[in-house]
Design a protein with these regions (language model features):
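PLP-dependent enzyme catalytic core of the Aspartate aminotransferase-like
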Residues: 98-107, 113-147
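Alpha-helical elements of Rossmann-like donor-binding domains used by nucleotide-donor carbohydrate transfer enzymes
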Residues: 13, 32-36, 51, 58, ...
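Conserved glycine-rich beta-strand-loop-beta hairpin in the small C-terminal domain of fold type I
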Residues: 28-31, 35, 50-60, 72-85
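Short alpha-helical functional segments enriched in proximate histidine and acidic residues
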Residues: 59-62, 142
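A short linear hydrophobic-aromatic micro-motif
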Residues: 60, 69-72, 106-111
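Conserved core segment of the aminotransferase class I/II
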Residues: 1-53, 143
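Helix N-cap motif at beta-to-alpha junctions
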Residues: 7-8, 87-89, 128-130
Length: 147
């Protein structure tokens, strides 16, 4: 990856950190890959964005039909969906247990983003649809087992 930093002071601090961490040197394939992506990647990117939007829609429909207690917040510019799990009536520790131990899923805990994130989990939908569907089925079963 790379960074474009307009501010001279901030760019210098960033470069100093990267050099000290030995992250500053790219390799030939990285440079060629970036150049190719910018020159010839538009069609691929359009397909990926459409696929991810399809996964967002799939998740929304699946939750409404199978796990209505969990609502989703549609992402505006990302493939990360916040799941509003507050209707399940679980505290954050219980919610984490539900996702990790019962559903066997590793999601980001909403409290990573502050106290306002209590009752939320963050789901990455930039994955194959079959993987997403399997995860949602596992979550559905874990929620059904709560009852």
């Amino acid at each position: 990856s790379y960074a474009i930093i307009e501010n001279d002071e901030l760019r210098h601090r960033f470069q100093t950190y990267m050099e000290a961490s030995e992250f500053s040197e790219g390799h030939l394939f990285a440079y060629l890959s970036v150049a190719a992506a910018y020159s010839h990647g538009t069609e691929w990117l359009d397909q990926v964005v459409a696929y991810i939007k399809g996964n967002v829609d799939f998740t929304e429909t699946y939750l409404k039909e199978h796990i209505p207690a969990i609502k989703m917040i549609r992402p505006q510019a990302s493939y990360l969906i916040f799941l509003d799990c507050r209707a399940l009536g679980l505290n954050q520790e219980e919610l984490n247990r539900l996702f990790v131990e019962d559903a066997h899923l590793a999601l980001n805990d909403g409290t990573t983003f502050g106290k306002e994130g209590e009752g939320f989990m963050r789901l990455n939908v930039a994955c194959p649809r079959v993987t997403l569907e399997k995860a949602l089925k596992q979550l559905e079963q874990a929620v059904m087992d709560l009852k």
